Regions:
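Positively charged n-region of N-terminal signal peptides that target proteins for export
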Residues: 1-4
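Bacterial N-terminal signal peptides
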Residues: 6-14
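Sec/Tat signal peptide C-region and signal peptidase I cleavage site
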Residues: 16-22
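Sequence/structural segment immediately N-terminal to covalent heme-attachment motifs in c-type
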Residues: 24-44
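Axial heme c-ligation environment in periplasmic c-type cytochrome domains
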Residues: 40, 46-55, 59-68, 83-113
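Post-signal/leader-peptide non-cytosolic segments of secretory proteins
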Residues: 71, 80-81
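Hydrophobic "lid"/C-terminal helical patch
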Residues: 82, 117, 121
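Short, solvent-exposed mixed-charge patches
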Residues: 125-126
Length: 126
């Protein structure tokens, strides 16, 4: 029992910097998303329908992570979508979000930052 408790204690101590670093990374990513205007339409977690009965404007990032978790090309494709905007004729989120296309964000966020944000979003769900 003593060995088990010591092992668990060592593992918890070893994991603490990782958790702290992850929390710092999460805070940094949300700050970057706010500065870039992403949080105007998106949220990290799913939101309920609005008071007027309409769905949220854009998909929650957790839902994006779920949708694309097995897609090897998702990072590149979603980074391109962030930079150039979404195609208004393709309704990826029909019925779950508003019918507004995502505008190009190349002026609001650089491609390197967009890629970092997209990669962070894609690992929100293991």
């Amino acid at each position: 029992m003593r060995i088990l408790l010591c092992t668990v204690g060592v593992l918890l101590i070893a994991a603490t910097p990782v958790c702290a670093n992850q929390a710092e990374s999460d805070v940094a990513m949300v700050k970057l998303a706010n500065r870039s205007g992403c949080m105007t339409c998106h949220s990290v977690l799913p939101l309920p329908r609005r008071a007027d009965g309409l769905p949220p404007v854009a998909p929650a990032w957790r839902d994006v992570a779920l949708k694309y978790r097995d897609d090897a090309g998702a990072s590149e494709r979603l980074t391109r979508t962030v930079m150039t905007g979404s195609n208004p004729k393709v309704r990826h989120w029909a019925g779950r979000t508003g019918a507004i296309r995502m505008p190009p964000n190349a002026e609001a966020v650089g491609e390197a930052d967009a890629r970092v944000l997209v990669n962070w979003i894609l690992v929100l769900v293991p």
